[in-house]
Amino acid sequence: MGKRFSRTLPVAHTLMGSLLAGASFTAVAQAQDMPAEALDWQAWGEEEAANQLCRGRYVMPSYRLPAQENPEILSLEASEVDYAANGEALLRGDVVLRRGNEEVEAERVFLPADREQVDAEGNIAIRDGRALVRGEQAMLRLNEDRATLGNSHYVLYDQHLRGQANQLEQTAEGEYRLQDASFTTCDPGANSWQLVSSDIRLNQAEGFGT
């Protein structure tokens, strides 16, 4: 395996905050379900399964980058990094960004010289310990708490809930508004029921949708 490049940078806001606070995500609500493993799904063991209604649960994997003493620091790691004379940077190959409890994975990430925006492409996954959001294209405005994400799927770990949405925005901490969206508590690949609506509001702390 070739050498991977790592770096830390100070930024003003959290990555998940940038992705969910006042953000808009573009996706197809009725797209095909993602594979269970892509949604951080783990099956119960034989002994555990006997006492459970569902076949498994959603579990966030371990962080790939270590935590920094200063939670404002943005850590970067990638297989290849190209720096331009004007300060722009292009990261390629299994890119990982982490700040505080938020971690982002992508195949390619572009950082402008001012580091106020992140443009990511390819197999994107954003996790913060409570939620997972996946897509193929994302634009994060780090200093404005705004972002857009294409082809999005989401998981709320503790609520055993997953879904898709045309537009997803966070209206308050742990509260989300999804437009042209669906959600279900069924196991991945088993949509015995799902709610499909032009407007769904989710409360992550309470675990309900309206």
Features from the language model and the residues they span:
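Structural signature for solvent-exposed beta-strand/loop edge elements and short helix-capping sites
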Residues: 32-210
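Gram-negative bacterial Sec-dependent N-terminal signal peptides
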Residues: 2-30
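A general, composition-driven signal for non-globular sequence regions
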Residues: 1, 7, 24-26, 35-46
